[in-house]
From Swiss-Prot:
Keywords: ATP-binding, Cytoplasm, Magnesium, Metal-binding, Nucleotide-binding, One-carbon metabolism, Potassium, Transferase. One of its GO terms (cellular component) is cytoplasm. The gene is metK. One of its GO terms (biological process) is S-adenosylmethionine biosynthetic process. Its cofactor is Mg(2+); K(+). Its EC number is 2.5.1.6. This is S-adenosylmethionine synthase. It comes from Mycolicibacterium gilvum (strain PYR-GCK) (Mycobacterium gilvum (strain PYR-GCK)).
Length: 402
């Protein structure tokens, strides 16, 4: 029997101020990609009481979408559910300030004509697109769940999605968009054995009693519903500690309660702290930015490695130099869970996956408006939407390569 340990991950709803910003940035990105798939986009958003500020750099031929950014912003805020001043924010009446310039020509030079082409004379078209920045990105997969994600973050996301669902479908019509969930799981070694604690904080209308209404209804319609659907083989969910709105009241929320920024929930977006993170955020960035596209590719790699049975869990790191197509480094960690030599796994990854930025964009078909749905509830292991980096299309190739 291994020593019991507790691990915690959190999620937030789409109405959290930081997630509003991620959603706005990705909605602008999608609108521009729909009009011009080759758009270069780096959009950051800030929200605060009554105001939205959208700034960054864009180079695009999608002139109509660019001119309509203000409406794109308002529509996404209203879709999230901030449609009245009673909720602390209103997409119809809030101020929207746009401050967007063009992408730096120095950066564009390195992306458009990579070092391999510019200096080395490479003829392969995939050698012509360089990485949009230097950096390191991680991907991870583990056999904790059917979606090959760590259980704590997977469960936290399910709770957040359910919280939004019962708000939007009217089951609990007094809920407001802002909310957070947190899950603590007890592990025996690497096996999740017991759900220890669930923390759920949700914005609500004024006058709602915590003990007599909010807590029992959240437990019934959100927590119990999610745990019933979970059906995990090793996890005991029979008696968790449940904390609903432990401050006692959560009426003031959204941008009125806290300012929000794009890219401030990078652990929520990825693996809930279970795996390492290279530091780069995703939302508002087109796929020429390896912060986003290479992190997606690493998840694709890791998920296929685990699905192929080469390891029960794997973390893969890739690194790039700005303006260069080929990665400068690849690192594979299997934490002793491998079924074949890790050196063979690393070699097989190099043979099966082309990790040049242009190849990633091609193989995952990333020049499409597919990003707005990823802005909340995680970019990986999604069970509610289909994402190209979640496909298991390289399993047989990996098995053959090792």
């Amino acid at each position: 029997m291994s020593e019991a340990r507790l691990f915690t991950s959190e999620s937030v709803t789409e109405g959290h101020p930081d997630k509003i910003c991620d959603a706005i940035s990705d909605s602008v990105l999608d609108a521009l990609l729909a009009g011009d798939p080759k758009s270069r986009v780096a959009v950051e958003t800030l929200v605060t009481t009554g105001q939205v500020h959208v700034v960054g750099e864009v180079t695009t031929n999608a002139k109509e979408a660019f001119a309509d950014i203000t409406n794109t912003v308002r529509e996404r805020i209203l879709e999230i559910g901030y449609d009245h001043s009673d909720k602390g924010f209103d997409g119809e009446t809030c101020g929207v300030n746009i401050g967007i310039g063009r992408q730096s020509p120095d950066i564009a030079q390195g992306v458009d004509t990579a070092h391999e082409t510019r200096v080395g004379g490479a003829a392969d078209p995939l050698d012509s697109q360089g990485a949009g920045d230097q950096g390191l990105m991680f991907g991870y997969a583990i056999a904790d769940t059917p979606e090959l994600m760590p259980l704590p973050i997977a469960l936290a996301h399910r709770l957040s999605r359910k919280l939004t669902e019962v708000r939007k479908n009217g089951t609990l019509d007094y809920l407001r968009p802002d909310g957070k969930t947190q899950v603590t799981v007890q592990y025996d070694g690497t096996t999740p054995v017991r759900l220890d604690t669930v923390v759920l904080s949700t914005q609500h209308a004024d006058g709602i009693e915590l003990d007599s209404q909010l807590e029992p209804e959240i437990k019934q319609h959100v927590i119990d519903a999610v745990l019933t659907e979970l059906g995990h083989q090793t996890l005991d969910t029979s008696n968790p500690r449940i904390l609903v709105n432990p401050t006692g009241k959560f009426v003031l929320g959204g941008p009125m309660g806290d300012a929000g920024l794009t890219g401030r929930k990078i652990i929520v977006d990825t693996y809930g702290g279970w795996a390492r993170h290279g530091g780069g955020a995703f939302s508002g960035k087109d796929p020429s930015k390896v912060d986003r596209s290479a992190a997606y590719a690493m998840r694709w790699v890791a998920k296929n490695v685990v699905a192929a049975g080469l390891a029960e869990r794997v973390e893969v790191q890739v690194a790039y130099a700005i303006g260069k197509a080929a990665p400068v480094g690849l690192f594979v960690e299997t934490f002793g869970s491998e079924t074949v030599d890790p050196v063979k796994i690393e070699k097989a990854i190099g043979e099966v996956f082309d990790l040049r930025p242009g190849a990633i964009v091609r193989d995952l078909d990333l020049l499409r408006p597919i990003y707005a749905p990823t802005a909340a509830y995680g970019h990986f292991g999604r069970t509610d939407i289909e994402l190209p980096w979640e496909q298991l299309n390289k399993v047989d190739d990996l098995k053959s390569a090792v």
